[in-house]
């Protein structure tokens, strides 16, 4: 066999040696952050959450303090049922100052799905403080409150929203869920209720709404109005309730909250229930267009305490010991 030139041997070996080095060099080339962010955003829009998660993770390796990206990664992980990982990203995003309603909503959802119910309730309330009309958050929150045996708080939350819809000419949204909660409450042991001694109310549209039961009627949301003397009812509710009452004055002129003057009746209602607390002999006014509200003569039966934390306001009603 003829001898091979050593220079040819070296020439053959060098490409084989250099090729892996060249490939390694290519593999270490980073995709620009802007491109990763664009791809991740497109994947989110296309609901390809595996793609979104991968690209957000690569993006955050280069931009670790981007709070919006941290929140987006958490949402992608939430969508993939990776809730423990999502909670970590959401907490980082919030600690970095991110504060959007979708971040709060998905954070609450992941907290609930990892068994952190009390924290989830807090963050659902924060979500509603930003967007009160978010029905998914309201419905999910009500379910968690039922798990904690806070039935009336859940009913007030849903009834208040349905009352708002009715006032603007729309159909109630939570009728079915309210029926389910009322049924669960009737079947539960009252001694186990978290609301044996007090009821907590959430502020909606500038008002605290209390769950009130009148006779045979369903639980309704009443505005808590410390500036009004008497409780006001609608004629429709009074008729549905079939409650015992006495007419005190058959015809009076009353001024409504929006300034209208209407004809009304002053009555004395035998019994009403605010949450699970029964009140006897309650003075009230009723008319065809009266707004449902609890006046001072009913509220004076309770000790009221308000609280506000991180943008969320609550009012607690605790029956006075007479």
Describe each region flagged by the PLM.
Residues 1-2, 132:
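A general, composition-driven signal for non-globular sequence regions
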Residues 23-322:
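Pepsin/retropepsin-fold aspartyl endopeptidases
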Residues 13-22:
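Bacterial N-terminal signal peptides
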Residues 2-14:
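Bacterial N-terminal signal peptides that target proteins for export
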């Amino acid at each position: 066999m003829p001898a091979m030139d050593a220079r040819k041997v070296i020439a053959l070996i060098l490409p084989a040696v250099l090729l892996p080095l060249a490939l390694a060099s290519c593999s270490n080339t980073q995709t620009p952050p802007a491109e990763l962010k664009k791809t991740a955003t497109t994947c989110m829009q296309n609901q390809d959450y595996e793609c979104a998660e991968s690209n957000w993770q690569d993006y955050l390796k280069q931009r670790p303090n981007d709070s919006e990206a941290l929140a987006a990664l958490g949402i992608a992980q939430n969508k993939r049922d990776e809730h423990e990982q999502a909670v970590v990203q959401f907490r980082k995003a919030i600690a970095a100052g991110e504060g959007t309603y979708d971040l709060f909503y998905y954070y609450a959802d992941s907290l609930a799905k990892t068994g952190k119910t009390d924290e989830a309730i807090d963050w659902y309330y924060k979500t509603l403080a930003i967007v009160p009309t978010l029905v998914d958050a309201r419905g999910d929150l009500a379910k968690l409150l039922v798990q904690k045996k806070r039935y009336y708080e859940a009913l007030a939350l849903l009834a208040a929203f349905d009352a708002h819809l009715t006032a603007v000419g729309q159909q109630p949204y939570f009728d079915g869920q309210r029926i389910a909660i009322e049924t669960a409450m009737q079947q539960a042991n009252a001694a186990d209720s978290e609301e044996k001694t007090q009821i907590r109310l959430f502020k909606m549209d500038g008002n605290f709404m209390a769950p009130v039961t009148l006779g045979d009627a369903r639980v309704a949301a009443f505005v808590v109005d410390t500036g009004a003397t008497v409780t006001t009812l609608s004629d429709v509710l009074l008729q549905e309730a079939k409650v015992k009452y006495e007419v005190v004055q058959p015809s009076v002129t009353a001024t409504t909250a929006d300034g209208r003057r209407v004809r009304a009746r002053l009555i004395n209602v035998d019994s009403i229930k605010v949450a699970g607390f029964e009140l006897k002999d309650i003075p009230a006014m009723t008319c065809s267009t009266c707004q449902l509200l609890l006046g001072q003569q009913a509220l004076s039966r309770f000790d009221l305490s308000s609280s506000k934390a991180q943008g969320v306001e609550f009012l607690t009603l605790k029956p006075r010991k007479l």
